[in-house]
């Protein structure tokens, strides 16, 4: 299976250095953070016996928060906008810039390994809406068709603070500002809802759009996991779509912990656990996401 891989332009480099005593623990070293690219050169001057180490992390690709650009077919409810290589995040003026920056960084890094998947999602118009911490889900215009009565408004405002694809738009995902920023009123504490909801778009729009056999592969893994007794009593067994999104959360160390399983979650909430518990799914996810 041939895939286009991505060589990133920029990285965050954390340099750990000590010019005198190399026997120190790394966390005790002098540290410095740099933004570098593949052509950068770093000069180090170390005394005899000195030591250093470097950690490289992908640097998100994004612009700055602006008003809605002219020519964009975006509802007038939205006043803020930020973009990462064609994918955009938007919100009303009541949402902090910090939340939009965080959302943009997340989607940039999630797609950093597969530019072909990202390009297809850009072509389809994929985007993210952030629900303000003081806004209700039904305030967003995309939800008007399901928030069309007092009962439905009350239900959806209670039911969820984020969706991936349906019911609003198969090319959009949404999440709450309070979850992005881990604010006290977050009802999903311990999880990152954007990673879950955006994983649905990556799956259903991006990957399936460039790999027509992907859903067959995913369904086979989902059925096999169920037959092995994996994910019993969790949301991941609902269908192949939730299996993918829940496992992506665990891959990125942002799923909620429950032991025993509580009908939604179990104890497999982190990457190292997922790798040991469901190695075939872990292997699949590595095709699309950096470890």
Predicted feature descriptions by range:
Residues 2-7:
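Short, small-residue-biased leader/transition segments that mark boundaries at the very start
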Residues 248-291:
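Pan-zinc metallopeptidase signature
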Residues 205-257:
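Post-HExxH zinc-binding segment in Zn-dependent metallohydrolases
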Residues 61-85:
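N-terminal low-complexity, Pro/Thr/Ser-rich intrinsically disordered segments
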Residues 74-77, 84-87, 92, 96-223, ...:
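Acidic/His-rich structured neighborhood in mature extracellular/periplasmic domains
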Residues 15-39:
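Solvent-exposed beta-strand/loop surfaces of large extracellular or lumenal domains
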Residues 91-94, 230-238, 268-274:
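Active-site rim elements
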